[in-house]
């Protein structure tokens, strides 16, 4: 979680945000066992400042996880999935995840954390996939859980392509949506 402190100043919030941004970048590139000194340098702060905000790696990872889940959940809520066509909603889902790629990619490094993240984010995606099957857009020979696994894998690949600057946000989202839909679209 974010540090709990009586310090509610904008400076405190900016420093906390800088630390989380730096941690997301460093951890997505080097893994969650990366040296915290690297996180501090990337954030433009001293190690002592880092430890004032987050007492240890676990506290930093917990805060980063909460931040990532909040960011993706906000984007999914704002995406209007229930009002969009299934195809458009899938592209919006991909765009939401790719847009917070570094933060979400960190979650994927730890299976327990990833399962917790998917637990919180799965419901709207399961609903979308079930709607796709029900309306005949998505194939009905695969259960929602399997389609969800394929979608999750597609999300991760789109994030990686964007992080490596192989594709921009919009390109990665659109290409991944086409890839997913081409494989899961209902057959005539």
Q: What is each residue range found by the language model?
A:
Residues 105-115, 119, 134-179, 187-188:
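Hydrophobic/aromatic-rich alpha-helical bundle segments in the mid-to-C-terminal region
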Residues 44-54:
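Short hydrophobic/aromatic patch on the recognition helix
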Residues 27-37, 104-115:
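Short, flexible, glycine-rich and Lys/Arg-enriched loop motifs at helix boundaries
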Residues 31-32, 52, 139:
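Helix-turn-helix/winged-helix DNA-binding modules
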